[in-house]
Amino acid sequence: CQVVERGLDAKAKAAMLDAHNKARQKVANG
């Protein structure tokens, strides 16, 4: 996710990153 929104607060960003990382792990695990 290269989207950086000034309107997002840190919590929303952290949640998005967490979801992104989980999805990436899923792909890595097959």
UniProtKB/Swiss-Prot annotation:
Keyword Nucleotidyltransferase annotated: no
Ranges in coiled-coil conformation: none
Source organism, top-level taxon: Eukaryota
Post-translational modification note: Contains 3 disulfide bonds.
Range of residues in the leader sequence: none
Keywords on record: Disulfide bond, Neurotoxin, Secreted, Toxin
UniProt keyword Secreted present: yes
GO cellular component: extracellular region
One GO molecular-function entry: toxin activity
Subcellular location: Secreted
Tissue specificity remark: Expressed by the venom gland.
More details: Shows similarity with the venom allergen 5 from wasps. This similarity may explain why patients with allergies to centipede venom also display allergic reaction to wasp, honey bee and/or yellow jacket venom.
Family in the record: Belongs to the CRISP family. Venom allergen 5-like subfamily.
Protein name: Scolopendra 20528.11 Da toxin
Source organism (scientific name): Scolopendra angulata
Lineage of source species: Eukaryota, Metazoa, Ecdysozoa, Arthropoda, Myriapoda
